[in-house]
Structure formats: C-alpha cells, structure tokens
Amino acid sequence: MPLFIAFAFLFIIPSTAVLISNNSDFGTTNFVYSQPDHMNSNVTNSLNIQNIPVKKVHVGDIDIAYKTFGKGDPILLVSGSSSDMNAWEPSTLRNLSSNHTVIIFDNRGVGNTTAGTKSFSIQQLANDTAGLLDALKIQKADVLGYSLGSFVAQQITVTHPEKVNRLILLGASCGGKEGVPESPQLVKFFSEMVNKSINNIPITPQEVKMLLSIPMGSAWMELHPNFLEAIPEAKDLFAGIPSNTIKQQNDISQNWMATNWSGICDELTKISNPTLIITGTHDNNVPTANS
C-alpha cells in the first residue's frame, strides 16, 4: 500500500479474521474465524511508546533506527510498505511487551533509517533485518511481518532460518505474479491521496473514511463508526505526518514495488517454523486468497 497514513491503524483486524496455523505451538485448529476482542486494559497501560527513545545501530551500509521495550522472549516487528515504526498500533505494542521484548524499527530509507548505497529489494531488506538482530546480539526471535513486512519476514525465514523462532504473517502473500492483484481503482485512489499529501492539499473526511475502509472493510466500519476515538494515540499519529515524510516514504515504496519481488511461493516448503497467518476476510488491499 503506497500511502503511509493508511497504516496508522496497523494490527486492527477487520470484523472477521481468519487465523491459519501450521503448527500445534499456535494451537491445533488450522482455521479459526474470530471476532476481535477488546485489548486487556490492565496490561502495561503506563507504557508510552512515543516516549521510548529512538536508538541507532550501524548495519552494513545503513544506520537503522529502532526501539526496544518490554520483557521476555524477543519479538521483531517488520512494518508494511512506506510505514515507519510509529505506525504500529500503540495498545497492541503494550500488550506484546507484557511478555515479550519488542523490537520495532524503520526499514531502509524510511523514517530515521538511512537509505544506504545498496539497491532496494526484499532480499536486501531481509538481510538488513537479520543484521539488526545480529547487531542487537539477539540469536533468535519471533518475527511478525505485516503486508510488505510479511514478504521480508518470509524471506528471512528462508534465507536466515536460524534467526527465526516463530513466524507471524499479517495481511500476507508469498509474492510473485500468481496472486490476486490489487484493484486498479484502489491503486489510482492511493496515488491521488499521495499526491494530495505531498502537495499539502487537505484530504476530505469522506476520503479519510474511504482510506480506512480499504484495509478495514466497509462492514467493519459500519459496525464500529466511532472506532477512531477508541485509539487516540493512533489518531494523533494519523494527524501528525509531515508531507515531506509522506513523499519520502512514497518514493521508497515505489522503489520497492519496482523491484518486482519474484516471491517465495516455490520455497514455502523450506519453512518448518511454527507459523501463524492472520488475514481479514474484508481486507480489500490484501485479498484473503493471497494469504
């Protein structure tokens, strides 16, 4: 998805979600249809993700910006296309941090991470991410990837299997040209919204609603008309993205898409890690069939 602001609400699954597991570590049921529950409000409510200092570490030809917080086994979160680490939904991060050491970071060329000199590719992003784990002296972590981050997470698991404990894929595809393509109308709409953002043209309330209905699904939006007010921190993030950041991230996003990742569909049998796949039945941006 080439528009950063459409990702201000990551990890909110549309009204009905399909959870697919390949290993009993995640439960014995292969297909689970679930309604989203309210977050546990008692878990680490005092943790303010925005106040956690950003650190930097040199990996290869780039300086990667990252944050770590929480206690427990490490879990590494890989963001979607054109999203920086601030796009993750805050209450989800707080809940994860109750029993995990959470690592969030900016991908190459996004947010506070430098672009470096190497060409952009899914394999390069996977190498960057594996290098981050090495730099942080983390031998193995659970890896969660969202959207484009799911490509990176799969690639890491294939090329650096020793670094991945459990794999969680959200809004995922194994890439290539055999999947269900994104609607041309959606691509056109995203492009129009990006151009508005870059040129400081206000996005109308109706356009905001449409932006959110794409990953959420219109049925979910109708059932939760006031959901934005329920996550004020995400609302603040949504309202505070500078236009130059949006332009930078859109340029990077277009560069990623131009790499035309061939995917790992033919290599999925190499993944023996416990894997959980989460997909929304009403997600218009990442068709359920691709997951």
Regions found by a protein language model. Name each.
Residues L167-P202:
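Flexible "cap/lid" loop of the alpha/beta hydrolase fold
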Residues V59-T114:
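Conserved HGGG/HGGXW glycine-rich cap/lid loop of the alpha/beta-hydrolase fold
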Residues P205-D251, M257-S262, E267:
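Conserved alpha/beta-hydrolase catalytic His-Asp/Glu region
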Residues N284-N290:
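Conserved alpha/beta-hydrolase "acid-adjacent" motif
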Residues Q139-P181:
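Conserved hydrolase catalytic core segment
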Residues S81, T281-D283:
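Acidic beta-to-alpha connecting loop that harbors the catalytic carboxylate
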Residues I104, G109-L144:
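Active-site loop/oxyanion-hole signature of alpha/beta-hydrolase fold enzymes
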Residues I271, I277-T279:
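Short beta-strand/loop motif that positions the catalytic acidic residue
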